[in-house]
Regions:
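Extracytoplasmic gating/loop element in the C-terminal half of outer-membrane beta-barrel translocons
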Residues: 3-7, 92-194, 198-199
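Hydrophobic, lipid-facing positions within transmembrane beta-strands of outer-membrane proteins
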Residues: 70-76, 175-180
Length: 217
């Protein structure tokens, strides 16, 4: 009764396991991982405090919808002498995306979604994922707050669990259109053609987008 109608449930992520001691002294989550968890894996919160991470620790994460619950737009125009500049903005708010396909919704699996949007460039950057210092030569890459967990081979059940780790705010504000108009008063040639006035107009669409979500559009 205290949960929203039609919601996505999942785990609360606590970042990534820092080292072997962090794994050893944390609640056991090998059941959902299907293997022993390792440093660099996503670490989940033991919500009910029983020392084991399982479905009983899942909580509501988001409304079960991939469309924004807030949509808005605004525009206007500025006039100066014979010039008129018009503009139109459109935006959304209160909308989440889970960047993993555990929900069978739009999103991507880390390291396996090819060239979807900016995914390849982001995951290829070693600074964005947990990497052992033995590989990188730099201890700072063992970052428990990295954007992506450690690189793994095959189906990684631990990293693809629905959780707050993959939850992203995908609100945006888009400059949808700019319209520039210049009015030509009727000169001698225009009058001879029977034209009282002439407007020259330039229109640009979908100019730019501001959003905290950078992986793909």
């Amino acid at each position: 009764a205290d949960k929203p109608y039609e919601y996505y449930a999942g785990y609360i992520a606590l970042g990534l396991f820092r080292d072997e001691d962090d794994v050893k002294f944390s609640p056991d989550q090998s059941g959902i991982a299907g293997r022993k968890v390792l440093p660099g894996d996503i670490k989940y919160k033991d919500v009910n405090g029983d020392g084991v991470i399982n479905s009983d620790d899942q909580v509501p994460l988001s409304y079960k919808a991939n469309y924004p619950r807030l949509m808005y737009g605004f525009g206007g125009e500025v006039r100066w002498k014979k010039l008129t500049l018009g503009f139109l903005f459109k935006g959304t708010g209160n909308v989440d995306n889970f960047c993993v396909d555990g929900y069978k919704a739009f999103g991507f699996l880390p390291f396996s979604s090819g060239e979807t949007g900016n995914t390849l460039a982001i995951t290829a950057n070693q600074a964005n994922r947990w990497t052992p210092r033995e590989i990188s030569g730099d201890a700072s890459t063992e970052n428990p707050n990295a954007m992506f967990p450690r690189l793994s081979y095959g189906n990684d059940h631990n990293s693809t669990q629905p959780s707050t780790f993959w939850k992203a705010n995908v609100r945006y504000l888009r400059l949808q259109e700019i319209n520039l108009n210049y009015n030509l008063s009727a000169g001698k040639i225009l009058k001879q053609l029977g034209v009282s006035s002439l407007d020259l107009q330039f229109v640009a669409s979908n100019i730019c987008v501001w959003s905290p979500f950078k992986h793909f559009d």
